[in-house]
Amino acid sequence: LGLTPFTEGIVAMRVKGTTADASMETLFSDILVFPVTPYTTESPKLWIPGNYAAASGYGADWAPQDPLTPYIEAVEFGSTAYEGFVYMNVPSPNFKITLEQDWDEAYGDGGTGMLDLAGGDLSVTGPGYYYIQVDTDPDGDPGTNDASWSATATSWALIGAATPNSWNDPD
């Protein structure tokens, strides 16, 4: 229909009636015009461009517009909380958090776990898989700048008959 998600639009509709008997006339109802608000099933996202992207298999460094730039997703519709895992394969990963796949609004370091649209690069301690959590408006008041973030280093391993070390400790 070409309508924008979460924005009210106008739809015109009519019903077409037919039968299996080709000799019967096709009938159409009157056209009805009414407002609708479409929704999307796609979760809101935040992108994580940085100096680690190319070395980690995500495309170009510092390129939020790159379709391979990693992103994290909202935990549910209407939430300002986002989470996801990002692999960073450089000794000193630096990055920003963008609201879209561009640099128009990019969160940087606002000091101890806080985000600021005018802040410098965010960083983590070294290479690895990080569980990144962001809340763009934890107090629910868009008039306050209280956006926050955290990154937790994670360690993953698989064991079982399908792995080279079988059921033994993977370390």
Model features per residue range: what roles?
Residues 1-171:
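Insoluble glucan recognition modules
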